[in-house]
């Protein structure tokens, strides 16, 4: 995420490396490169200029404490200003209503229908609400079918009137149905267009007037950069939405939309969406995003995801086995499954400070650990629960069973033993009481 921008900002900060203090000259040079990096990231020049002028004003004359370098001080100033530019603080979704109505709008292909499903899943699993999805795209039967499939996948009800060609009528009857079924949130997926046009605007405006939504969320594809910002502005000028959703952020190497959109439309970014999985949706926190743009990681979000996925009872059970030095392959695979549920692997690793830059060119997919799983699945139950049983002959059989070279199996076994030794040493030092639930998995490379 935002790798190109990260690299260019890093290069800009290097101007201050080795400098004893901040001066007008070295600030001017650094600020010029930051501005160029932002413009290259598809940030509007006016926004980039105003942003860097603020940085310059704050940086010039700042006293550098002995504990930090001029470069570190500049990074902090840029982080604070980026945070402010993107909204300053999280703005929660308004779900007050009987039921609360959330209208989803956006261009065709922006990820609008997928986001509708993700939002329903988020409200059901994270907020304990009972949502109803509504298919109000009367022009694309495929969109109705997609929403039906997503609703079935996440276990929520969906309102579809396939023969009704009046989107306003569908929205009205869906809200009435939600009231009768004690649904507390209605999510209406409206029709998209290839471009903003009068028909689209009028239809969404009519739905808005008919059902008085608590939220109107405009979904934009972050990979379209400044085009996304311009589209959001045109839509907001006409319909005054309440928040922005950025989709496909995992494929955005530039970051122009995330940085510019709040400034341009003066509406908060409420969620960011990564990938196709229904749980791949994050609340937007400006400060955390600023940290990620600057390559500082996002440990807070990483820990939150871990806490959501790790089962406390299972964590205690595994910790007990670690303390007794009885951690086995079955435990390892169980932990692996929980980590996979946390989201896109490359995205997760990018939340660790300093790691994002190191892995940017690596091919790390959600299938990264399939080789490890294949090796473990080729073991007998007895072998999984007793790693010490696995001798040379058993390794050959496991290699044949999983289709992996014997060298890969041996390498995994060696790494597993090293990890168990590390756990044993950490146990002696009492380190496990300070770790996140389940102890985590460290040191294992994918075969």
What role is predicted for each listed range?
Residues 16, 42, 78, 107, ...:
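Residue-level signature of catalytic and energy-coupling elements of molecular machines
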Residues 141-147, 228-231:
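Short, glycine/polar-rich helix-capping loops at beta-to-alpha or helix-loop-helix junctions
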């Amino acid at each position: 995420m935002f790798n190109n921008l990260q690299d260019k900002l890093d290069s800009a900060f290097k101007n201050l490396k080795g400098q004893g203090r901040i001066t007008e000259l070295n600030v001017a040079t650094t600020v010029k490169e930051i501005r160029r990096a932002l413009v290259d990231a598809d940030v509007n020049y006016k926004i980039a200029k105003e942003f860097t002028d603020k940085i310059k004003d704050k940086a010039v004359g700042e006293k550098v404490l002995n504990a930090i370098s001029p470069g570190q001080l500049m990074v902090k100033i840029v982080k604070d200003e980026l945070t402010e530019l993107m909204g300053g603080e999280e703005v929660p979704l308004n779900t007050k209503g009987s039921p609360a109505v959330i209208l989803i709008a956006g261009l065709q292909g922006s990820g609008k229908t997928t986001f509708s499903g993700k939002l329903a899943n988020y409200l059901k699993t994270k907020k304990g609400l009972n949502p109803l999805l509504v298919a109000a795209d009367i022009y694309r039967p495929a969109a109705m079918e997609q929403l039906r499939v997503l609703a079935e996948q996440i276990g929520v009800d969906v309102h579809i009137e396939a023969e009704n060609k009046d989107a306003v009528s569908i929205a009205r009857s869906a809200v009435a149905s939600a009231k009768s079924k004690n649904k507390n949130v209605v999510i209406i997926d409206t029709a998209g267009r290839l471009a903003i046009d009068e028909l689209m605007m009028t239809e969404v405006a009519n739905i808005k007037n008919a059902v008085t939504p608590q939220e109107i969320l405009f979904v934009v594809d972050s990979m379209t950069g400044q085009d996304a910002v311009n589209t959001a502005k045109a839509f907001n000028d006409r319909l005054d939405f309440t928040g922005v959703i950025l989709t496909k952020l995992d494929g955005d190497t530039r970051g122009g939309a995330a940085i510019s959109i709040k400034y341009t439309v003066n509406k908060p970014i409420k969620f960011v969406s990564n990938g196709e999985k229904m749980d791949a949706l994050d609340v937007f926190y400006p400060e955390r995003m600023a940290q990620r743009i600057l390559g500082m990681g996002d440990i807070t979000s990483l820990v939150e995801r871990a806490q959501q996925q790790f089962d406390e009872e299972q964590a205690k059970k595994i910790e007990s086995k670690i303390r007794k030095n009885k951690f086995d392959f079955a435990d390892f695979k169980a932990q692996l499954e929980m980590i996979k549920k946390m989201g896109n692997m490359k995205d997760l690793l990018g939340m660790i400070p300093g790691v994002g830059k190191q892995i940017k060119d690596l091919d790390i997919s959600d299938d990264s650990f399939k080789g490890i799983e294949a090796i473990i699945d080729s073991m007998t139950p007895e072998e999984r629960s007793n790693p010490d049983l696995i001798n040379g002959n058993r390794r050959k059989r496991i290699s044949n069973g999983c289709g992996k070279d014997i060298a890969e199996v041996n390498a995994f076994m060696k790494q597993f033993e090293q990890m168990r030794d590390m756990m044993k040493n950490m146990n002696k030092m009492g380190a496990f009481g300070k770790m996140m639930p389940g102890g985590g998995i460290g040191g294992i490379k994918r075969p």
